[in-house]
Swiss-Prot record:
It catalyses: Endonucleolytic cleavage to 5'-phosphomonoester. Residues 409-433, 726-745, 1598-1626 are annotated as: Disordered. It is found in: Cytoplasm. It comes from Mus musculus (Mouse). This is Endoribonuclease Dicer. SMART domains: DEXDc, DSRM, HELICc, PAZ, RIBOc.
Length: 1916
């Protein structure tokens, strides 16, 4: 041992080698360079691994410090030799015997062998029983079992009687083999061995070779004797010699501190006092009965502690400790009941106070006086001064500080491609809270004996730091190991203590503190960094304590200083000699003695010549590897290979001596390195040279195969070799902030216009096409939804309808539905005639009528739009058609158009005057199909009504429904001063003409096709059947509009029809484009073919049962369930878009005779009734009261707007009604942050799909089906209407493509989410398979990197953008008045400035066009306002706007100078004007959101406000689809004030990520329609290579169907041979795509490969039977189970590549299975199910259930233990657990819930086996699924019935506002702890190996506690 200093050093000569003084340069060996890579020796492997090697090699006695490693070595050795023991006894196979000392140890061993292997184990522990067995009985046992575990007594009997001969045993394991030294059966058994010719391999295990103090000679003798008896070599584990026998040994220094001279005499005096007191207490003869506490105990303890501090540290410290103890004593004294005890405590208290007083005479306790400390302390301070840091400015670079290989680096993410920005905020910046590491070169521990010494020494050092600038750098802390031991139960206060200790350790690990003062507890087991200074303040008393504290000094340059008092030094030197001798003996027993290497370290310099270096580019002094640096290169290379947290891969070097005395080495790299062959070096003179040369040769080979780069460093995963895959694109130059591909980055794109509608305006005398828009009522509105008992008007009943006149043909598209008040109407676009021409004059008439429809009937014209048919991009005519003469054929109805032109009521109100002389005459037929206009009000924008019914039994003289007026006539006279001329005319019941122009989805269903809860259907029916709520008009006061009601009803459908037509044509165009680019489908469809209708996959009608049960079923299953399900939102001054903002008196009779409900709040009654005229007053009151009362009553379920019904309030406020009051009751639904039950992170409309425990609702409500599910089924069975074609050959249905282009924000009846998920998993599968087959030698890290680059959102976004998808996508809700450009119109540039959203000026928060609330805004308010409407409308006469419609549409706005519109993506901008409203966080009933200057609000602004967002003000039974899905719209605060200016009619703003989603959805769409081969071709055409390219010439071969089938993996799914293979596009590309080939070899060329293979997979037949699949090529099977640490497998790779493949395959198969589930899960449920089923926990649990772990091949001690725990846990639980990567151990253990860790390796082999089967079966997904489906089916069923959610997500949904997760903290044993605080409800902690595991453990505890305290929440 060349330890520099064993001799005592005098004070002067204390020479420490600190990093600062090191010749290696200042940074060498700083403690935070945690894992130093060794340069002169190979990275050592774990000692258990070394021991296992030794045991495989020869008979071995393993000496370990603990029991844990023993099992590992024994079990692994058994497994390695298992091929010798399978099969029948005797001729073929042997048996393995484990001997234990006592019966109770048998079971323990048995379970270990059974857990980790599939061997049959027999246990024999009972001598009585076993002794009586006959030979036959035994031989049966031996036949049955392969491993026999018996107590030594049983074994002795068996062997002595010859039941089993030693030659039949292949391995004999002796547990506790040290017993063999004594007279013990072990000895007898070994005697038998002497006579046996073929003796078994022997493994002895012992943990107790060293106990307490022992003499080196004895020890040596003991070991030698044991070796003799067991005929083995002893091998010690490195935990007995210094822990890493390879790291440079610390420099050991014994410092003689010199005697303590007590000049002041204070020391003597204090000592005297304390000793006198102790003597007194000891003399007190207090009788102690055995049961009682000793009254003097505490006093003795305190005084002796105090005395010890005085002696060791000196008077200053004694004073400090006395002060501390006095405080402690007060507590005891206060609680002490018993007189005697109390007296002793008081005595002690007095004494301590006396000591303090004595000290005060000598020094002021405030400052540290070094006269009063012991020499030991002085010495310590002197040592610490040597570690003073250098000046900071020399080193500014911090980059390697937080290096990823550190032990204490917390990896934040477990997944390979984290595109989600989920946990960014969790990352702590380590540099923030403490000085840069370079100010910190110390990382030290001072070991002391007593707790108090630690505490006071810490105080002293802190104090010294304040006074001595040289010590100011120290930041110290102490740890006293209170209950730090792993498993003892802990009390509450210990818990607190424990937390504190952990915090101390955390800081020390993070190098926030640089000095730890610790009691011996830290010697073992606690995870702390490598220190460069260890000081033993008290000398070590036994070998173990010496080694363990020395073992803490592991930094490359470190000092181990032992401080000794002069009087102790002699005896300690003796001890130290003993320790050294023991260490030496043990070291020699170490399987690889490192002494040899150390001896010649210094000779290394002249090795250079021994072997020439490997130099690149010799001319310019290029990079080189020399014989001295080669080993370092190899170590570094191995460290970079992919591995799991348990395995640190290291090279293995074997050196053998040749007969001539030279040595040669063989180097084996870890098995996942592409360089597989072992490398044999040339013979050299010394071991050291042999090892170095072989490394040098290896470097050369690695460089040649591209594993080392141009600088001879390991190539990263980003390696150049695979450049072509990464296809590194130039990042587009955009000014748009945000990361490309993320949700945060949004850009504008023009909306696409299908080619066939572009500039297709008919020209005079040019041939035209006339299409008829066919409308048929296919599903009439069911009675229970027809609350007003309205008559239904089937459109087909009247012949006059609309047509489209265009100059270009329109391709065939599927029929599609629109939903009118009468029910579902199917729309078809049929060609009526073509090739005819029209004259200029006719066209002008048609054009005028076209404009009339859009501007007057639909009132869509507004200042920003201008009718310019010649200049418009999308231009065609809409015109009326009718049956001409009697021919029964439709044609253009010119006569009708001319009549309209002549009509007086065409635009305004005709001025008919009736008088007494010419009274009004009522003609019934005029009113049968009429639209009427009241003539006495709203002159500029008159209201139009349908006549619903003629009440012939009523006349103007009938009784008026409200007491204020006698009759109707009186009402008109009084209110409008109108006289009627005909008092016998009947009255008219009227309905508003519809202003709901978005008819794409039905009103009674939400998007998922779920019925909306119709709160009080019964009540409402009654209401509509009575007269009260009807609107009644007098015919004489109305004019009849020239457009009949039947045609008007059809006109209302036009915007929806044209919009849907437009979208479907865009989709059809995309289908055709893909057909030419990818060769999937045909370019133009056959003439006679039409795709099946677009439908949403919903049930058509809803049976009344389910309706009546709505309250309990559909709500019961919805997440945001509220007890009072009447979600009434008061709808007040409802008004129709374009009406004049004058508040005149209105007269619609909305009569309501009910009194105010008693329970409504009193203030409502008073305020409301004051200003309302009586009639309106009543019904207003009723509605307000109800509505508001409802709001008062409970938390509003704001969260899923889908559940709002517009409430029908046909009432107008009168002029005098103050707007503020209205606003008080307006009370918007509260912002979502108050919704107690539903998180706003999840408002994506799945909020009300079933997550209940399988509530019956699932079956009764029509679940959201894939929009085209029905269609897909038809396609699959190929029974499409035109027989002979199918979407498999033609390409997908445009309806399905449209689904893939529709974001959930568009609030349509379908969206891309389901397809996206399917596409996502297929994409992963396709790319994975391609990479796997194309790069047979790339390891998993690289494959994974390439995959994540290819599937990243950023890449997909780029490809989607190139393909032109953004323009075709449907991103926002269809809202004709706001964002639809009618055909023939253009956006008028001059006037549209107010229409444009201006750049750079920010108002409140228009949430970008897609109208969804972004994650960032979630926290803010709901950002919606509702303005009172000026006139009540019937239920759907109500414009629905989404956020983006914060556009003001009316012309009046121009006049009133409305608001300048500005858009900012930041939800909080400074409110500087009255118009930038901010909603209060909590809008309570009385609060006024618009308190700012409401008085001067001019009314046209109200008008404007009505456009803001009525969709929140929903009337009662109308359906508004508008919900927000935060995942799409992230207008985050963090985007900075990015503002985007764009025009809503022609442009759309889309987040990059949505484009990526759309690419995935299209892939899903091609996959479901055309099969897998087509989907692969589609990907290739996008530019994602997933198939190999073959050049034109070899095309014929590629078409050979046999080969083809290789890749059409699921033949049932992909009839890919039918699909044309390559693109036969006009572009004539030379690319053709072939099929992937299975990589040729899975086994390496190796002389005995077959034999080795059979050895290695012996026993796997049972496994093959179990999974029911026989491998054709067994090498795949072996590879699937080989872990990277298993270096015995030299013939295949490890499982990582197969795992990479299998992971993607299982993900795809499971996703596909879920997608095709007839239950048609909604996207949210699909996502949850997928993450519940495709995750490590589930895979690992299944792997254990199917015994995968027994065949697992790994050599990794930690992994062994984790698997062990997990398997035991699984067996106890024996039941699969839901989501999340951990399973809970016990519910009770509330203190510290540590979830059981799921070994990732188990999940990995579950996946890798799938990959192996896939490869072995010739790439057949079907075969994989046949093996895996049976294993997974029970879980799939279980979860589908009751979808699990991850605890983290569930918690965030339960407590969206209040749950906050802390950053990760490290616990003392190196795990991670996360705390989640639920504000107001407590803090919950979770612990686990990774951040994610800990986070979900914490969430799970929080949930448990919350659920326990909230029984009232159903469905939790």
């Amino acid at each position: 041992m060349k330890s520099p200093a064993l001799q005592p050093l005098s004070m002067a000569g204390l020479q420490l080698m600190t990093p600062a003084s090191s010749p290696m340069g200042p940074f060498f060996g700083l403690p935070w360079q945690q894992e130093a890579i060794h340069d002169n020796i190979y990275t050592p492997r774990k000692y258990q691994v070394e021991l296992l090697e030794a045991a495989l090699d020869h008979n071995t006695i393993v000496c370990l410090n603990t029991g844990s490693g023993k099992t590992f070595i024994a079990v692994l050795l058994t497994k390695e030799l298992a091929h010798q023991i399978r099969g029948d006894l005797n001729p073929h196979a042997k048996r393995t015997v484990f001997l234990v000392n006592s019966a109770n140890q048998v079971a323990q061993q048995v379970s270990a062998v059974r857990t980790h292997s599939d061997l049959k184990v027999g246990e024999y522990s009972d001598l009585e029983v076993n002794a009586s067995w006959t030979k036959e009985r035994w031989s049966q046992e031996f036949t049955k079992h392969q491993v026999l575990i018996m107590t030594c007594y049983v074994a002795l009997t068996v062997l002595k009687n010859g039941y089993l001969s030693l030659s039949d045993i292949n391995l004999l394991v002796f547990d506790e083999c040290h017993l063999a030294i004594l007279d013990h059966p072990y000895r007898e058994i070994m005697k038998l061995c002497e006579s046996c010719p073929s003796c078994p391999r022997i493994l002895g295990l012992t943990a107790s070779i060293l106990n307490g103090k022992c003499d080196p000679e004895e020890l040596e003798e003991k070991i030698q004797k044991l070796e003799r008896i067991l005929r083995s070599d002893a091998e010690t584990a490195t935990d007995l010699v210094v822990l890493d026998r390879y790291t440079s040994q610390p420099c050991e220094i014994v410092v003689d501190c010199g005697p303590f001279t007590d000049r002041s005499g204070l020391y003597e005096r204090l000592l005297m006092e304390l000793e006198a007191a102790l003597d007194f207490i000891n003399d007190c003869n207090v009788a102690v009965h055995s049961k009682e506490r000793d009254s003097t105990l505490i006093s003795k303890q305190i005084l002796s502690d105090c005395r010890a501090v005085l002696v060791v540290l000196g008077p200053w410290c004694a004073d400090k400790v006395a002060g501390m103890m006095v405080r402690e004593l007060q507590k005891y004294i206060k609680h002490e009941q018993e007189e005697l005890h109390r007296k002793f405590l008081l005595f002690t208290d007095t004494l301590l106070r006396k000591i303090h007083a004595l000290c005060e005479e000598y020094f002021s306790p405030a400052s540290l006086d070094l006269k009063y400390v012991t020499p030991k302390v002085m010495k310590l301070l002197e040592i610490l001064r040597k570690y003073k840091p250098y000046e900071r400015q020399q080193f500014e670079s911090v980059e390697w500080y937080n290096n990823r290989n550190q032990d204490n680096y917390v990896s934040w993410s477990d997944s390979e491609d984290d595109d989600d920005d989920e946990e960014i905020e969790e990352k702590e910046k380590p540099e923030t809270n403490f000085p840069s590491p370079f100010t910190n070169i110390l990382c030290g521990i001072i070991f002391v004996e007593r707790r108090y010494t630690a505490v006071v020494l810490n105080r002293l050092i802190k104090e010294a730091g304040k006074q001595d600038p040289e010590l100011a750098y120290i930041s110290s802390n102490f740890i006293t190991g209170h209950g730090i031991g792993k498993n003892q139960p802990r009390s509450k206060q210990m818990e607190a203590e424990f937390r504190k200790q952990e915090e101390v350790l955390r800081k020390f690990r993070a190098h926030e503190t640089n000095l730890l003062i610790a009691t011996s507890v830290v010697e073992e087991g606690v995870d702390i960094p490598k220190c460069n200074l260890v000081v033993r303040f008290d000398l070590p008393t036994e070998y173990r304590s010496y080694v363990q504290s020395k073992g803490r000094a592991r930094a490359p340059i470190s000092n181990y200083v032992m401080l000794a008092d002069t009087d102790k030094i002699k005896s300690f030197e003796e001890d130290l000699k003993t320790y050294k001798a023991i260490e030496k003996i043990l070291r020699n027993k170490c399987s690889k003695s490192a002494d040899g290497a150390e001896a010649d370290v210094h000779a290394g310099v002249d090795d250079e010549d021994a072997f020439p270096p490997y130099v690149l580019r010799p001319d310019d002094g290029g990079p080189r590897v020399t014989i001295n640096t080669a080993i370092g290169h190899i170590n570094r290379y191995c460290a970079r290979l992919p591995s799991d947290p348990f395995t640190h891969l290291a090279p293995k070097c074997r050196t053998r001596e040749l007969p001539d005395g030279t040595f040669y080495s063989t180097l084996y790299l870890p098995i996942n390195s592409p360089l597989r062959a072992s490398i044999v070096g040339p013979p050299m003179d010394s071991v050291r040279l042999a090892e170095r040369v072989v490394a040098l040769i290896c470097c050369e080979k690695l460089h040649k195969i591209g594993e080392l780069d141009e600088h001879l460093m390991p190539v990263g995963k980003e390696t150049v070799k695979y450049e072509e895959e990464l296809d590194l694109h130039d990042e587009e130059e955009t000014s748009v902030p945000g990361r490309p591909g993320s949700t945060k980055r949004r850009q504008c794109y023009p909306k696409a216009i299908p080619e066939c509608l572009r500039e297709s305006y008919p020209k005079p005398d040019q041939p035209c096409y006339l299409y008829v828009i066919g409308m048929v009522l296919t599903t009439p509105l069911p009675d229970e939804l027809n609350f007003r008992r309205r008559k239904l008007y089937p459109p087909e009943d009247t012949t006059r309808c609309f047509g489209i006149l265009t100059a270009k043909p329109i391709p065939q598209i599927p029929h599609f539905p629109v939903y009118t008040r009468s029910g579902e109407v199917t729309i078809s676009i049929e060609l009526k005639k073509s090739g005819f021409t029209l004259s200029q004059q006719m066209l002008e008439l048609i054009t005028r009528l076209h404009q009339y429809i859009f501007s007057h009937i639909l009132r869509l014209e507004k200042p920003a739009l201008e009718f310019k048919p010649t200049g418009a991009e999308s231009a065609y005519c809409v015109l009326p058609l009718n049956v001409v003469n009697d021919s029964g054929t439709l044609d253009i109805d010119f006569k009708f158009m001319e009549d309209i032109e002549k009509s007086e009521a065409r635009i305004g109100i005709p001025s008919t005057k009736y008088s007494k002389e010419t009274p009004f005459v009522f003609k019934l037929e005029d009113y049968q199909d009429a639209v009427i206009i009241p003539r006495y009000r709203n002159f500029d924008q008159p209201h139009r009504f349908y006549v619903a019914d003629v009440y012939t039994d009523l006349t103007p003289l009938s009784k008026f429904p409200s007491p204020e007026y006698e009759t109707f006539a009186e009402y008109y006279k009084t209110k409008y001063n109108l006289d009627l001329t005909n008092l016998n005319q009947p009255l008219l019941d009227v309905d508003h003409t519809s202003s709901r122009l978005n008819l794409l989805t039905p009103r009674h269903l939400n998007q998922k096709g779920k019925a909306l809860p119709l709160s009080s259907a019964e009540k409402r029916k009654a209401k509509w059947e009575s007269l009260q709520n009807k609107q009644i008009l007098v015919p004489e006061l109305c004019a009849i509009h020239p457009i009949p009601a039947s045609l008007w009803r059809k006109a209302v459908c036009l915007p929806s029809i044209l919009y849907r037509l437009h979208c479907l044509l865009t989709a059809e165009e995309l289908r055709a484009q893909t057909a030419s680019d990818a060769g999937v489908g045909v370019r133009s469809l056959p003439v006679d073919f039409r795709y099946p209708n677009l439908d949403f996959g919903w049930k058509k009608s809803i049976d009344s049962k389910s309706f009546i049960s709505t309250c309990n079923s559909s709500l019961a299953e919805s997440d945001n369930y509220c007890k009072h399900s009447t979600t009434v939102v008061p709808e007040h001054a409802a008004h129709q878009g374009a009406t004049r903002p004058s508040l005149e008196n209105h007269d619609q009779m909305s009569v309501n005779c009910k009194r105010l409900p008693a329970e409504s709040p009193a203030k409502l009654q008073s305020e409301v009734s004051t200003d309302l005229t009586a009639i309106n007053g009543l019904s207003y009151n009723k509605n307000l009261a109800n509505g508001s009362y409802d709001l008062v009553n409970r938390d509003f379920c704001q969260g899923n707007q889908l559940n709002y019904f517009k409430q029908e309030i046909p009432v107008q406020p009168t002029t005098s009604y103050p707007i503020q009051n209205l606003y008080n009751y307006e009370n918007q639904p509260k912002p979502s942050n108050e919704c107690p039950l539903l998180s706003n992170t999840y408002l994506d409309g799945n909020a009300n799909t079933s997550t209940s425990d399988g509530s019956p609702a699932v079956s009764t409500m029509p679940a959201m089906m894939n929009a085209v599910k029905a269609l897909k089924d038809r396609m699959d069975s190929e029974q499409s209407p035109s027989v002979g074609y199918s979407s498999r050959t033609l390409g997908p249905n445009p309806g399905l493509i449209l689904q893939a282009l529709t974001l959930s924000n568009a609030s349509d009846g379908f969206n891309l989410e389901r397809l996206e998920m399917l596409g996502d998993s297929f994409l992963k599968h396709a790319i994975t398979t391609y990479l796997f087959c194309t790069y047979p030698d790339a390891h998993e890290g690289r494959l994974s990197y390439m995959r994540s680059k290819k599937v990243s959102n950023c890449n997909l976004y780029r490809l989607g953008k190139k393909k032109g998808l953004p323009s075709r996508m449907v991103v926002s809700i269809f809202d004709p008045p706001v964002n639809w450009l009618p055909p023939g119109y253009v956006v008028n540039q001059d006037k549209s400035n107010s229409e444009k959203w201006e750049k750079d000026e920010m108002t409140k928060d228009c949430l970008l066009a897609n109208g969804k609330l972004g994650e960032a805004c979630e926290e803010e308010e709901d950002l919606t306002w509702r303005a009172p409407k000026e006139e009540a409308e019937d239920e759907d006469d109500f414009l629905e706007y989404d956020q983006e419609h914060i556009q003001f549409i009316d012309s009046m706005l121009m006049g009133s100078g409305a608001f300048v519109r500005k858009i900012s993506l930041s939800p909080f901008s400074a409110s500087d004007s009255a118009y930038e409203w901010k909603m209060p966080k909590k809008a309570s009933l009385g609060s006024m959101p618009f308190a700012s200057g409401l008085e001067d609000f001019d009314y046209s602004s109200w008008d404007a406000m009505c456009y803001l967002d009525p969709s929140k003000a929903v009337e009662e039974d109308d359906f508004v689809v508008g919900f927000w899905n935060p995942s799409e719209e992230n207008c985050g605060v963090d985007t900075g004030k990015q503002s985007i200016s764009y025009d809503l009619h022609t442009e759309q703003c889309i987040a990059d990520k949505s484009i990526a989603d759309c690419v995935e959805a299209l892939l899903g769409c091609y996959l479901t329609s055309c099969g897998e081969r087509a989907a692969q071709l589609f990907l290739c055409s996008l530019g994602l290579k997933v198939l190999p390219v073959i050049k034109r010439t070899s095309r014929e071969k590629a078409l050979d169907p046999a080969q083809e089938n290789g890749s059409s993996q699921q033949k049932s799914l992909s009839g890919s041979c039918a699909a044309p293979v390559g693109p036969r596009s006009s572009a004539g590309k030379d690319l053709e795509y072939g099929c992937l080939k299975i990589p040729p070899r899975c086994m390496f060329d190796h002389p005995d490969a077959e034999k080795t293979l059979n050895h290695l997979i012996s026993g796997f037949e049972t496994f093959e039977k179990k999974i029911n699949y026989r491998f054709k090529n067994k090498a795949y099977l072996l590879q699937a189970f080989t872990h990277a640490s298993y270096h015995y497998n030299t013939i295949t790779d490890c499982y990582q590549r197969l795992e990479f493949l299998g992971d993607a395959i299982l993900d795809y198969l499971i996703t596909k299975h879920l997608y095709e589930d007839p239950r048609q899960h909604s996207p949210g449920v699909l996502t949850d199910l997928r993450s519940a089923l495709v995750n490590n926990t589930i895979f690992a649990s299944l792997a254990v259930k199917y015994d995968y772990h027994k065949y697992f091949k790994a050599v990794s001690p930690e992994l062994f233990h984790v698997i062990d725990d997990f398997v035991k846990f699984q067996l106890e639980k024996n039941e699969m657990q839901g989501m999340d990567s951990e399973l809970r151990r016990s519910e009770e253990d509330e203190e510290k819930e540590e979830d059981i860790e799921v070994p990732k390796a188990m999940g990995d082999i579950f996946e890798s086996l799938a990959g192996a089967i896939y490869m072995d079966s010739g790439m057949s997904l079907e075969v994989v699924w046949q093996v895996y489906y049976p294993m997974m089916q029970p879980l799939i069923e279980k979860f589908s019935a009751n979808v699990p959610r991850s605890p983290v997500r569930e918690l965030l949904e339960m407590e969206p506002e209040t749950a906050k997760f802390s950053p990760a903290e490290r616990t003392y044993d190196g795990k991670v702890r996360v705390t989640v605080e639920v504000v107001g409800k407590g803090k919950f902690k979770g612990v686990g190996r990774s951040y994610r595991i800990a986070k979900s453990a914490a969430a799970r505890r929080a949930l448990r506690s919350l659920k326990a305290n909230q029984p009232q929440v159903p469905n939790s």
